[in-house]
């Protein structure tokens, strides 16, 4: 790598990985280093690592400024705070994070709500999930089986070839009312869909990079110039002073929305 005099790193927030850090450190003669990203994770450690690899961070603009000058689509966020029954919250107890996620992604009422929401929305909709086997596939089947025959429903995970994902992306850009059920790993970063009107966060996350990158999928201006809408599913399983993990994570996401100056409303829904 010593023969290279210039390095350009796209989506450079990912350059904190060991493999990319190793490559960068071997580019000893690379006097010119350019890294571009729309998202940092908000921690000082992350910023210091990237500064060590590329140099001083320069903030060119913000999402809010790009929305104000009509470069990006306007975004409306609806936080759907799911209130589980008192009996469920009381019996839920103090569980480990993974046990809580298992409970949430397998909850029949929650998945039915996501299905109905996806089917009721107008425009192209992206439903993002985290777990393939226990959430993504069952959710896709629920939505597919509930949709009218003419509506196009797509499923994307790491098991789907990259070439097929690109075909799906191109098809959706020609549609007006399709649904993509996709894993966060495949559709949260680097995928641009011109006519994407809605995003549903079906899985909880507190990662600033993942949240903002996922939102970025919907900010490209659509042909009809309509606003983008994000539906953030939050889960309230707290009991008295005991808060559940995913409720805390939803509070972290709301802090991100406020920091980015996004418009958001919180709606309580009883399951």
Regions found by a protein language model. Give the residues of each.
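Conserved RecA-like helicase motor-core motifs
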Residues: 126, 140, 144-166
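Conserved interdomain hinge at the start of the Helicase C-terminal
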Residues: 89-130, 134-145
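Short, conserved loop/helix-junction motifs that constitute active-site signature segments
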Residues: 1-4, 24-30, 194, 221-225
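Conserved RecA-like P-loop NTPase helicase motor core
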Residues: 39, 158-259
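Post-DEXD/H (motif II) to motif III coupling segment of the RecA-like Helicase ATP-binding lobe
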Residues: 5-78, 257
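A short beta-strand-to-loop transition that corresponds to the Sensor-1 phosphate-sensing loop
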Residues: 11, 36-40, 130-132, 182-185
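Residue-level preference for the first positions of well-ordered beta-strands
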Residues: 6, 124-126, 178-179, 198
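Charged phosphate-binding loop/patch that engages nucleotide di/tri-phosphates or the phosphate backbone
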Residues: 254-255, 259-271
């Amino acid at each position: 790598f010593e023969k290279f005099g210039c390095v350009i790193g796209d989506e450079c927030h990912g350059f904190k990985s060991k493999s990319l850090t190793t490559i960068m450190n071997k580019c000893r003669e690379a006097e010119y280093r350019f890294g571009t990203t729309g998202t940092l994770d908000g921690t000082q450690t992350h910023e210091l690592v990237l500064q060590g690899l590329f140099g001083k961070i320069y903030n060119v603009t913000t999402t809010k400024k790009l929305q104000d000058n009509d470069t990006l689509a306007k975004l409306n966020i609806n936080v759907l705070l799911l209130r589980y029954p008192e009996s469920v919250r009381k019996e839920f107890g103090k569980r480990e994070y993974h046990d809580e996620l298992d409970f949430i992604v397998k909850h029949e009422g929650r998945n039915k709500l996501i299905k109905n929401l996806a089917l009721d929305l107008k425009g192209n909709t992206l439903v993002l999930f985290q777990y393939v086997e226990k959430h993504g596939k069952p959710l896709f089947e629920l939505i597919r089986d509930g949709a009218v025959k003419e509506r196009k429903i797509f499923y994307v995970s790491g098991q789907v070839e990259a070439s097929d994902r690109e075909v799906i992306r191109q098809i959706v850009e020609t549609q007006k009312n399709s649904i993509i059920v996709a894993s966060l790993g495949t559709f949260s970063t680097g995928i641009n869909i011109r006519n994407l009107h809605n995003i549903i966060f079906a899985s909880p996350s507190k990662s600033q990079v993942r949240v903002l990158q996922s939102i970025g999928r919907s900010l490209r201006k659509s042909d009809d110039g309509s606003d983008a809408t994000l539906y953030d599913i939050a889960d309230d399983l707290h009991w008295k002073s005991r808060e559940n993990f995913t409720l805390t994570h939803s509070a972290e996401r709301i802090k991100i929305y406020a920091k980015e100056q996004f418009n958001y409303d919180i709606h309580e829904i009883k399951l």
